UniProtKB/Swiss-Prot annotation:
The lineage of its organism: Eukaryota, Metazoa, Chordata, Craniata, Vertebrata. GO terms for cellular component: 6-phosphofructokinase complex; cytosol. The gene is Pfkl. It is found in: Cytoplasm. This is ATP-dependent 6-phosphofructokinase, liver type. Beta-D-fructose 2,6-bisphosphate binds at residues 470, 527-531, 565, 572-574, 628, 654, 660-663, 734. GlcNAcylation at Ser-529 by OGT decreases enzyme activity, leading to redirect glucose flux through the oxidative pentose phosphate pathway. Glycosylation is stimulated by both hypoxia and glucose deprivation. It comes from Mus musculus (Mouse).
Length: 780
């Protein structure tokens, strides 16, 4: 779209009415979506109506359809479930029900529907849209509406958002609620692990997901489970023997617990359900292990939404309004979905069709195809799970040895990356060393060989088990080279923040002086600041955002109770404003000051005036985030003094510096998984590179592509040579020159009720669901 069009969009909603409803099973993050749709709708000048109790409210009408204003959706982003209620509705499946629904919508002049729900709810919406014309004719015949009304409201437009914890909708990488459900599952697994270890027990955990094994698959990956049952990949006949053998094996190698994860829809090769009680009895009879079953049930739907779900829902909600405004009678009903970290629009019925194809493939026992149709993120998770589950200590040794170290500040997920890298390295036949305390430890010779079981139980641990330091290699080059020679190290895997990247760059630049540095090197970016070039997401930043978000939720609660209070919260991140921006969106902050988005005293004045105006409404609290290095003069103390004196008599002010609690406790499911995948992919890349550069009995690597940063860029995993990244880096402020998340700031400002230039808004493209988009090239 051209820039001019978007400026027009500012009032393009004028005269339009949008109805929002949540339907089917609830999911965490639905409230954030309702909030975003409502505010974006009001922002573009449309009238917005909240439809209570899903389709039931639509059919019954009356008090169930209420106009919304900006404040109707205040302070709901942190609540689980849906404040407008949801119901599974029989009446809407009949033509009479839909006729009543059409009549109720016309009473309010609503011809735009935003439906947040699962595939059933969205299919229902599409049927409704297709029948709209004939429903109006019928209403005219019955004399309920006039001919002119029917002409004015001749078309119904629909935008769908997929809200379902099962992540069973094809075409979107993540559905609203999935990440939060994984949070609940991991909290339970962490809690169960401690009791299982005390008693040497086996636990069989049953997770939800109907006919989709996504939750089971990802929680098995993120918890290092011993065995997994999912409907898309039933076990081979005779699996009972294999499973018991595997469980016995892990026990004999010193493990004190076994975890078996089973999806509620799990079946065997012949379509017969596998129940958790059957698995339990099997383990007890064959192995005599003390075994317990835990069925997680509706716990998974509950609790506060994770940061990912809040941001995903907010982004999708805004995009849904744009889709409604841009729709014409000829455009198909669309679903707003996520692909990588980009939002896209997909034709609703194409997605529903592929979702049905999965079920059909499973019914017809074409299981490989079912996994492929689930999409690339599912297929990739499955491949990595199989790889890790079937890995064994290699019988044949390769000639290669490599070292793994952590550099920079601790970040959640580092240990998960170390664990999977160590095990992948050992199963490739390499000798793997771990180095304590970063480059300094390498210089002092704190190097030890590591075995398969030395990294057991590391997945869910926060911080860095290897110990980490910020020291760069330059001052210790002689000693480092000496130790690389002593231990005959052919490759380095460096897991850490900006220092890890800068350190490897220094080693590469010293290759001319020291032949020992002509080895393969790979950096896995791991820092809460998300400031490493070569990747969109660093390991640990998801955990940090969630930690900061939980703190801000509590601070907001305190401000709500006190009335007329503004909190100024300082986040970490160095010069990089990622943490402040993303946390700001997740907690509905009024402003977030960051270094990348320069601001002056006029902006601060505007913010204070905006806050004063806000205090005249029913929302008498404010939350302002400030990145620690966003401005050398406008410090947290300065902002506190400014807000306090300008707001005297209207509001009072308090500050909070979050500090190191942002490094997080246990890693979030995203970071455990991301760490595990990066560890595997980096190690496989290192192995391949070592074979490429092995000549005449020695390793000699001096090409630029022998030292890379691995990262997720848009939709693919990419390896970027550190020498090429050098020109993309601002070394003075320790961050990349280009940052993708800056366009999220528009969303932050708009949702906080500021005028924004729509010229900068990037709307999602309409794509199609094809086998190609579902295939996995390099996806995650």
């Amino acid at each position: 779209m051209a820039t001019v069009d978007l400026e027009k969009l500012r009032m393009s909603g004028a005269g339009k009415a949008i109805g929002v409803l949540t339907s089917g099973g609830d999911a965490q993050g639905m409230n954030a979506a309702v909030r975003a749709v409502t505010r974006m709708g009001i922002y573009v000048g449309a009238k917005v109506f909240l439809i209570y109790e899903g389709y039931e409210g639509l059919v019954e009408g009356g008090e169930n359809i209420k106009p919304a204003n900006w404040l109707s959706v205040s302070n709901i982003i942190q609540l689980g479930g849906t404040i407008i209620g949801s119901a599974r509705c029989k009446a809407f499946t009949t033509r009479e029900g839909r006729l009543a629904a059409a009549y109720n919508l016309l009473q309010h002049g609503i011809t735009n529907l935003c439906v947040i729900g699962g595939d059933g709810s969205l299919t229902g919406a599409n049927i409704f849209r297709n029948e709209w014309g004939s429903l109006l004719e019928e209403l005219v015949k019955e004399g309920k509406i006039s001919e002119s009304t029917a002409q004015n409201y001749a078309h119904l437009t629909i935008a769908g958002l997929v809200g379902s914890i099962d992540n069973d909708f094809c075409g979107t990488d993540m559905t609203i609620g999935t990440d939060s459900a994984l949070h609940r599952i991991m909290e339970v697994i962490d809690a169960i692990t401690t009791t299982a270890q005390s008693h040497q027990r086996t636990f069989v955990l049953e997770v939800m997901g109907r006919h989709c094994g996504y939750l089971a698959l990802v929680s098995a990956l993120a918890s290092g489970a011993d065995w997994l049952f999912i409907p898309e990949a039933p076990p081979e006949d005779g699996w009972e023997n294999f499973m018991c053998e595997r469980l016995g094996e892990t026990r004999s190698r010193g493990s004190r617990l076994n975890i078996i994860i089973i999806a509620e829809g799990a079946i065997d090769r012949h379509g017969k359900p596998i129940s958790s009680s059957y698995v339990k009895d099997l383990v007890v009879q064959r192995l005599g292990f003390d075994t317990r079953v835990t069925v997680l049930g509706h716990v998974q739907r509950g609790g506060t939404p994770s940061a990912f779900d809040r941001i995903l829902s907010s982004k999708m909600g805004m995009e849904a309004v744009m889709a409604l405004l841009e729709a014409t009678p000829d455009t198909p009903a669309c679903v707003v979905s996520l692909s990588g970290n980009q939002s896209v629009r997909l034709p609703l019925m194409e997605c529903v069709q592929v979702t049905k194809d999965v079920q059909k493939a499973m019914d017809e026992e074409r299981f490989d195809e079912a996994i492929q149709l689930r999409g690339r993120s599912f297929e990739n998770n499955w491949k990595i799970y199989k790889l890790l589950a079937h890995q064994k200590v290699s019988k044949e040794k390769s000639n290669f040895s490599l070292a793994i170290l952590n550099v920079g500040a601790p970040a959640a997920g580092m240990n998960a990356a170390v664990r999977s890298a160590v095990r992948t390295g050992i199963s490739e036949g390499h000798t793997v060393y771990i180095v304590h305390d970063g480059f300094e430890g390498l210089a002092k010779g704190q190097v030890q060989e590591v075995g398969w079981h030395d990294v057991a139980g590391w997945l869910g641990r926060g911080g860095s088990m290897l110990g980490t330091k910020r020291t760069l290699p330059k001052p210790h080059l002689e000693a480092i080279v000496e130790n690389l020679r002593t231990y005959n190290i052919h490759a380095l895997l460096v897991i850490g923040g900006f220092e890890a990247y800068e350190g490897v760059l220094q080693l590469v630049e010293a290759r001319g002086r020291y032949e020992e540095l002509c080895i393969v090197m790979c950096v896995i970016p791991a820092t809460i600041s998300n400031n490493v070039p070569g990747t969109d997401f660093s390991l640990g930043s998801d955990t940090a955002v969630n930690a900061a978000m939980e703190s801000c939720d509590r601070i907001k609660q305190s401000a709500s109770g006190t009335k007329r209070r503004v909190f100024i919260v300082e986040t970490m991140g160095g010069y990089c404003g990622y943490l402040a921006t993303v946390t700001g969106i997740a907690v509905g902050a009024d402003a977030a000051y960051v270094f990348e988005d320069p601001f002056n005293i006029h902006d601060l004045k505007a913010n204070v005036e905006h806050m004063t105006e806000k205090m005249k409404t029913d929302i008498q609290r404010g939350l302002v985030l400030r990145n620690e290095k966003c401005h050398e003069h406008y410090t947290t103390e300065f902002l506190y003094n400014l807000y306090s004196s300008e707001g005297r008599g209207v509001f009072d002010c308090r500050t909070n510096v979050l500090g190191h609690l942002q490094q997080g406790g246990a890693p979030t499911p995203f970071d455990r998984n991301y760490g595990t995948k990066l560890g595997v992919k980096a190690m496989l890349w290192v192995s391949e590179k070592l074979r490429d550069v092995y000549r005449k009995g020695r390793v000699f690597a001096n090409a630029p592509d022998s030292a890379c940063v691995i990262g997720l860029r848009k939709k693919v995993v990419a390896f970027s040579p550190v020498t090429e990244l050098k020109k993309e880096t601002d070394f003075e402020h320790r961050m990349p020159r280009e940052q993708w998340w800056l366009n999220l700031r528009l969303m932050l400002k708009m949702l906080a009720h500021y005028r924004i230039s729509m010229a900068d808004y990037v709307s999602g493209e309409l794509e199609h669901v094809t086998r190609r988009t579902l295939s996995i090239d390099k996806g995650f």
